[in-house]
Regions:
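C-terminal regulatory or interaction extensions
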Residues: 1-242
Length: 242
């Protein structure tokens, strides 16, 4: 059994002082994986949005993204360090800090395209147990879920040679984008790759599409999801805003 040491704290504000709740887990990981999520979910507020007759509630913390982030912290941490994995929850964001910096050659900029599992056997065990669909794809799923729920992409500020600091914001940025994705359709979104989601996000924000993503642009144009509006400029398709 994989032994796991974690501290989970909840703070209602970011000011210094004692946490409102603090839980410590020091046992086999499979025995506390659900308990850790359940503790987070106790303070997982729903954000309510309405646009005409269109009404929906979005959890502040996506279960899929949070679970993937925990699995990443456990499978990629440096076990030569005696430190624990820390989970710090605030009303609108969650931080996960794991011992050991990013593996050699991995940066926040290339983390989606360069997989280097520090503990391959743990990652493979998670895949065999069905906790992850495919070893090495956890961060991709986190990015996709952040875009799908219109929340800021993962933030690695505070990461250094000794710790990986991952912050996931729970703040929904634009309900109109959520409605756009709803009209695109869940079945269609299931066929999207990580690159497809990133392109849609760049088009939504009016930013140039990076060169390493452009190979997927024709597919999204053919699907009617984005439109070209100038040289190297794209926008979300107008048909889904009507």
């Amino acid at each position: 059994s994989l032994l796991f040491s974690s501290n989970c704290k909840y703070r209602s504000t970011e000011t210094t002082g004692p946490a409102q709740q603090r839980l410590e887990f020091r046992q086999g990981f499979f025995g506390i994986y659900d308990a850790l999520w359940n503790a987070i979910n106790l303070r997982n507020d729903l954000q309510h949005f309405q646009d005409g007759l269109f009404i929906w509630d979005i959890p502040t913390f996506s279960e899929e993204a949070i679970r993937e982030a925990i699995l990443n912290a456990v499978s990629h941490r440096d076990y030569r360090s005696a430190g624990s994995v820390f989970v710090r929850q605030y009303p609108r964001k969650l931080e996960i800090v794991s011992p050991g910096g990013l593996p050699q050659g991995i940066t926040p900029e290339n983390i989606l395209w360069h997989q280097y599992p520090r503990n391959r056997r743990i990652a493979e065990a998670f895949a065999r147990c069905g906790l992850v669909e495919r070893s090495g794809q956890g961060m991709n799923r986190i990015y996709e879920e952040c875009i799908r729920t219109n929340k800021p992409k993962p933030d690695f500020r505070g990461t250094d040679a000794y710790n990986v600091n991952l912050t996931l914001s729970g703040e929904v940025q634009d309900p109109q984008f959520l409605r756009f994705l709803e009209k695109v359709g869940r079945e269609r979104l299931k066929s999207f790759s990580t690159k497809d989601f990133l392109i849609v996000d760049f088009a939504y924000r009016g930013r140039p599409i990076p060169g390493d993503l452009k190979e997927r642009v024709p597919f999204l144009i053919e699907e009617g999801v984005i439109e070209k509006i100038g040289r190297d400029k794209y926008t979300l398709s107008r048909q889904f805003f009507q």
